[in-house]
Curated annotation (Swiss-Prot):
Enzyme kind, highest EC tier: isomerase
Protein's UniProt name: tRNA pseudouridine synthase A
CDD domains cross-referenced by the UniProt entry: PseudoU_synth_EcTruA
Enzyme Commission (EC) number: 5.4.99.12
Residues the record marks as active site: 52
Function description: Formation of pseudouridine at positions 38, 39 and 40 in the anticodon stem and loop of transfer RNAs.
Similarity comment: Belongs to the tRNA pseudouridine synthase TruA family.
Assembly and interaction partners: Homodimer.
InterPro entries per UniProt: PsdUridine_synth_cat_dom_sf, PsdUridine_synth_TruA, PsdUridine_synth_TruA_a/b_dom, PsdUridine_synth_TruA_C, TruA/RsuA/RluB/E/F_N
Keyword Isomerase: yes
Gene3D superfamilies, per the entry: Pseudouridine synthase I, catalytic domain, C-terminal subdomain, Pseudouridine synthase I, catalytic domain, N-terminal subdomain
This protein's UniProt keywords: Isomerase, tRNA processing
Length: 259
C-alpha cells in the first residue's frame, strides 16, 4: 500500500482538537472522512502533532496508507473537494517510503503564537489571536524567553495531564517580535524544538505575557523554571492564538519545501 504525506492547514475554532473523538468534530476525523469518500473503507492517519481545541495548523503534517497509487496533486485536489465546507485544506501531498512516519521521522516542530494588542473587539481576527487590551514590553519578554533556551527540566511548563515520559526537552528557539498586523499591533512568539510537552508553548506565552506587563521580571522566569513545579508557572494562555507552523524532516518531503 503506497504511503502519502499530507501537509495540512486548518482553522481550529470549530474543532475539539486534531485527534479523532467520539461525538466531537476533529481535524483528523474530517480528513479520514474525506479519505473514505475517495477510497471506501476505514482510514487512520497519523500526525506530527496533536493540537488541542482551538489551535490552528499552518504546516501540520500527516500520513496515510492508500490502495491506489495516486498522483499526489490529484490526491490533494480530491481530498480538498470532499473536505468542503470544513476549514481544512491539504496544501501539498507527496509519496513517501513505507517506513516514513509523520511523527517519528520529524526532527523539529515550529509553533507561532499571536497576541493582538487593542481594546476594540477583533472582528476579523477573532478566534485567531489572543487579544489583550494593554501594551507589552517586547524586550523584557525576550529577556525572559532567553532564560528558557537550551536543555531543561520543563516540569513547570507542562500540564498536569502530560503523558510524556520525561519533562526534559531542548528548546532551540523562543523569539519574540512586535509586528504590525492588519487589525493592530501584535506580538509574535516563534518557538522551535524537536518536540514539546503538553501545553508547553501556551505556558511559555502566558508566563512571558506577565513579564511584558511588568508583573514579572525576566529573572522570575528563571526562578519558575528552576522550581520544577507547575504551581510556579504563569497563566496558561488560550489556544486560539497558537499555530503549528512547520514540521521539519531530515530531507525535504514536499515540493513546496524545496522552493
Amino acid at each position: 500500500m503506497p504511503r502519502f504525506a499530507l501537509k495540512v492547514e486548518y482553522h481550529g475554532k470549530p474543532f475539539a482538537g486534531w485527534q479523532r473523538q467520539k461525538d466531537q468534530p476533529s481535524v483528523q476525523g474530517a480528513i479520514e472522512a474525506a479519505l473514505a469518500r475517495i477510497e471506501p473503507g476505514e482510514h487512520t492517519i497519523a500526525a506530527a502533532g496533536r493540537t488541542d481545541t482551538g489551535v490552528h495548523g499552518l504546516g501540520q503534517v500527516a500520513h496515510c496508507d492508500l490502495e491506489k497509487n495516486w498522483d499526489p496533486f490529484r490526491l490533494s485536489e480530491a481530498l480538498n473537494y470532499h473536505l468542503k465546507p470544513a476549514p481544512v485544506a491539504i496544501v501539498d501531498a507527496a509519496l513517501v517510503d513505507d517506513e516514513w512516519h509523520a511523527r517519528f521521522s520529524a526532527v523539529e516542530r515550529q509553533y507561532l503564537f499571536r497576541i493582538l494588542m487593542r481594546r476594540a473587539p477583533a472582528t476579523h481576527d477573532e478566534g485567531q489571536v489572543w487579544q489583550i487590551k494593554h501594551d507589552l514590553d517586547v524586550a523584557a519578554m525576550q529577556a525572559g524567553a532567553n532564560m528558557l533556551l537550551g536543555n531543561h527540566d520543563f516540569t513547570t511548563f507542562r500540564s498536569s495531564i502530560c503523558q510524556a515520559a520525561s519533562p526534559v526537552k531542548t528548546l532551540d528557539e523562543l523569539r519574540v517580535e512586535r509586528v504590525q498586523g492588519l487589525s493592530g499591533p501584535e506580538v509574535h512568539f516563534h518557538v522551535r524544538a524537536r518536540s514539546f510537552l503538553h501545553n508547553q508553548v501556551r505556558s511559555f506565552v502566558g508566563t512571558l505575557e506577565r513579564v511584558g506587563t511588568g508583573a514579572w521580571s525576566p529573572e522570575d522566569v528563571k526562578h519558575a523554571l528552576e522550581a520544577k513545579d507547575r504551581a510556579a508557572c504563569g497563566p496558561v494562555c488560550p489556544g486560539h492564538g497558537l499555530y503549528l507552523a512547520r514540521v521539519g524532516y531530515p530531507d525535504p518531503v514536499f515540493s513546496s519545501d524545496r522552493v
